[in-house]
């Protein structure tokens, strides 16, 4: 049995152990090799390289903590800048006197491109040959990849240094076949050799269906068409390892049409939702009974992110397979893939164009999703189709309470924003400073000045500090009957909201019109 390295190994300690072995009349080279093999490494150079890397990591953690502790607030803000998600930190605070060991490690992981510390820790403890494989994969260096694999074919699959308790399931970026697709998507490998890189790994023994089918899931999620082809050519299961359609769900949701077509050509199963996304109207119609009801199995295949859900022990279905839910998803896939003939048919069968589409990660309507995807000619056609068939610009998503116009704006889809803004609801006209359009809308329907959104917010609640026409907006709303002391569903007044989101000038103007700042809540 191999000896285990300590959690924080020291090269100096290893060199002392080499000296101990040399006392038995062993040559320096033999002593180093003996020690390396005791710890499960093929050579002294690999053991030394691993330990030096771990020592440098510990030094880096210590340097970061010391610099943070003695730095001013601007230094601390700079040090915290690489953070991916502040919510993952114990204490993300540039005014804090120190940063914890845990937060320092997470910050370093984020700086290296890893969302979580355990993912970066896993990478650091990979077998050195596996790390060399991943390094070659990431830049598309086929010659170097073949060289490493020829010396150690087992490096085509993830393995870790002895004594390291690898997380389960294996982090995706510790899997060489996953890294092929990620490198294509991130633009690290621009050599166009994704197929050849994948084939070299498979020829060396890489498992095409490892970790529940992660390699093909990665290829379809990252839009790596040639990688997907290589995997399928070598036996990757086109419907996923459990035959539940997980790969197609990713391709559909992420709008990788070429990959969806590839999966279908290679025999992937289609339910009514996937057939709708592929424009297979004949197949779509085959799922309806004579009286228009959906047949059993119409929504039999997975929702997006099925692999992640299975890894957590959950079902691949995010939502109940009711007729309304199945129709909503089918309409969603048809629209984001520009299959408007299919969409027309689904609407005739009762699909709700303004439903919050179930079973997805976005908790929004189809119009929200299309507005965020960006404007190319097919998107414009879909937008016009949706609006002509009654899609609402005032429905708000459940996570961020944004409208489709807001989604276009925050996703920087300015062409779509410009197309939609003049048709937007009154709340968005206030939010986006459209004073001229606001006047016209209120002249036509003054009652809108007092209208409320789903959270009870009036147009006045949408005032904020970046408006150039704030006073004019307030005045025109008041002139058409807006209540300067209106409260939202949580009991918050207009003035409370503007006091938080607006400017002192806006607050004073509202006060001059009779607004009062009272305690939140209703009696």
Regions found by a protein language model. Give the residues of each.
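Intrinsically disordered, low-complexity eukaryotic regions enriched in glycine, serine
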Residues: 1-146, 151
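Alpha-solenoid repeat scaffolds
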Residues: 155, 162, 183, 187, ...
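Ankyrin-repeat boundary/"N-cap" motif
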Residues: 127-135, 158-186, 209-220, 241-252, ...
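Short, structured interface segments
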Residues: 47-48, 113-124, 252-266, 405-421
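Ankyrin-repeat intra-repeat helix-capping/turn positions
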Residues: 140, 193, 223, 255, ...
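Conserved ankyrin/ankyrin-like repeat signature
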Residues: 144, 193-197, 226-227, 258-259, ...
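Extended repeat-based scaffolds of very large eukaryotic assembly and lipid-transport proteins
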Residues: 58, 66, 124-197, 280-282, ...
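Ankyrin repeat domain, specifically the short helix-to-loop turn at the C-terminus of the second helix
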Residues: 149-155, 196-207, 229-237, 262-268, ...
């Amino acid at each position: 049995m191999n000896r285990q390295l300590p959690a924080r190994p020291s090269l100096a300690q290893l060199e002392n152990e080499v000296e101990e072995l040399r006392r038995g009349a062993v040559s320096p080279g033999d002593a180093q090799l003996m020690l390396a093999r005791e710890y499960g490494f093929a050579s002294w150079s690999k053991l030394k390289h691993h330990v030096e890397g771990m020592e440098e990591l510990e030094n880096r953690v210590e340097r970061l903590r010391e610099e943070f502790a003695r730095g001013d607030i601007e230094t601390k803000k700079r040090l915290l800048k690489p953070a991916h998600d502040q919510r993952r930190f114990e204490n993300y605070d540039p005014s804090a006197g120190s940063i914890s060991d845990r937060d320092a490690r997470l910050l370093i992981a984020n700086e290296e491109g890893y969302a979580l510390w355990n993912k970066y820790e896993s990478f650091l403890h990979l077998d050195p040959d596996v790390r060399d494989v991943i390094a070659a994969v990431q830049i598309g260096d086929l010659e170097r990849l073949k060289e490493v694999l020829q010396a150690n074919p087992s490096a085509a699959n993830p393995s870790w240094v002895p004594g390291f308790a690898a997380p389960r399931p294996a982090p995706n970026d510790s899997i060489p076949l996953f890294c092929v697709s990620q490198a294509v998507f991130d633009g690290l490998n621009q050599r166009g050799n994704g197929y050849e890189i994948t084939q070299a790994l498979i020829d060396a023994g890489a498992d095409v269906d490892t970790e529940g089918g992660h390699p093909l899931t990665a290829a379809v999620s990252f839009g790596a068409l040639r990688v997907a082809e290589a995997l399928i050519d070598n036996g990757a299961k086109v419907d996923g390892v459990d035959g539940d359609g997980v790969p197609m769900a990713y391709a559909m949701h992420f709008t990788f049409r070429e990959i969806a077509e590839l999966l279908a050509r290679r025999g992937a199963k289609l339910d009514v939702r996937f057939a709708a996304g592929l424009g297979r109207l004949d197949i779509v119609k085959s799922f309806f009974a004579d009286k228009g009801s959906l047949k059993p199995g119409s929504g039999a295949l997975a929702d997006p992110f099925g692999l992640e859900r299975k890894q957590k022990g959950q079902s691949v279905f995010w939502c109940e397979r009711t007729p309304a839910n199945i129709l909503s998803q089918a309409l969603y896939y048809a629209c984001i893939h520009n299959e408007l003939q299919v969409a027309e048919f689904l609407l005739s069968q009762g699909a709700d164009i303004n439903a919050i589409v179930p079973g997805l990660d976005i908790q929004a309507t189809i119009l929200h999703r299309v507005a965020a995807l960006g404007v190319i000619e097919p998107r414009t056609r879909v937008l016009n189709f949706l609006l002509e068939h009654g899609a609402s610009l005032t429905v708000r998503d459940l996570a961020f309470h944004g409208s489709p116009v807001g989604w276009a704006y925050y996703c920087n889809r300015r062409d779509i924003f410009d197309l939609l803004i003049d048709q937007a609801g009154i709340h968005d006209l206030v939010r986006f400073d459209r004073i001229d359009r606001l006047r016209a809308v209120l002249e036509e329907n003054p009652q809108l000045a007092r209208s409320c959104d789903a959270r009870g917010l009036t147009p006045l609640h949408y005032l904020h500090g970046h408006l150039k026409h704030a006073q004019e907006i307030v005045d025109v709303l008041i002139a058409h009957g807006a209540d300067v002391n209106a409260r939202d569903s949580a009991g918050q007044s207009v003035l409370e909201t503007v006091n938080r989101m607006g400017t002192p000038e806006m607050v004073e103007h509202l006060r001059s019109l009779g607004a009062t700042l009272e305690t939140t809540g209703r009696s």
